[in-house]
Amino acid sequence: IKWSNGVTSRLKFGKYMKKRGWIVLFLAFPLWMQGQSAREEIGKNPALAAGKYYAYQAPEEKLTPAPAGYEPFYISMFARHGSRYLTKEKKYAAPLSLLLEADEEGVLTPDGKRVLKVVASLAQEAEGRYGELTPKGAQQHRELIDRMFHRYPEVFSDGTHVDARSTYKTRAFLSMAAGCVELKGLNPKLNVTTQTSEADAYYIKYKNPLYEAQHLENVDSVYRAADSVYVHPERLMKQMFRDSVYVEKHVDAVKLMMDLFELHGISQSSYNQPDLSFLFTSEEQYDLWQRNNFEWYYEKGPSPLSDTCMYKLERNLLNNFIETADTVIASRKN
């Protein structure tokens, strides 16, 4: 099992199963929605517009049983860390400071004052915990492991070796810890080992600054163009501020809209926190999702604007999946 920053899992089936075996778990980068259109999915469930901040839920799909004569014997899992707080203090402090100043000047509308209260509440909970796992995030991984254990009990027989690894980010390590503690509680006879090390980063969360600099050299102009297409803050500014002259002089409207949308998304990561759903129209939520989704496509996908090659940074991860599974199959162990 590997823990880092996305969620995907793989299950191998075979006609043999030994009592002793291996399970590999990971945590890394988020995946995108497929099937019906994104607009339709977000329309049915606006929380999905949060993108990488979506507090993922237990899947409801019915699983296809193994073919007759086959039974599960090995799991290779790669999962994102659980829900978290925003990574930097300024992500809370900048919009909060702007809103406090506007409130002192008496230019906030009733909705603007409501936004101020929500931002202040989110900032207070996150203080000193920037980038860390939330209680909801830990619970997500306990539930994930619980589902896996009960769906595939054959894989988790006594003595099975669970090799759990994470990146060195606190949120990834604590996600791994939550999952492993849950698993050990479900079967104390499992042999669970954990590792959080830079040594595993080359495949769990590989980075190549020179490669990225070469293929993302136009990042500033690309994002300015994306903002001009997807971010239209004029209506929202009128909803929040009484004085358009004040906004023109003191507010970067595009940045504020994106900052508030990010805070709206991250509000899902906590229990009982208010959100900013009253602030964005359905069209604005979809447009802002498109803006953020484009960023992922540009930086991590086959975008022609980044030479259609950024996905190749995940080669080491794919190789690890294949090599680990091949080793397990060849050894005739879980």
Regions found by a protein language model. Give the residues of each.
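Bacterial Sec-dependent N-terminal signal peptides
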Residues: 3-38
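Signature for phosphate-centric chemistry
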Residues: 36-161, 169-333
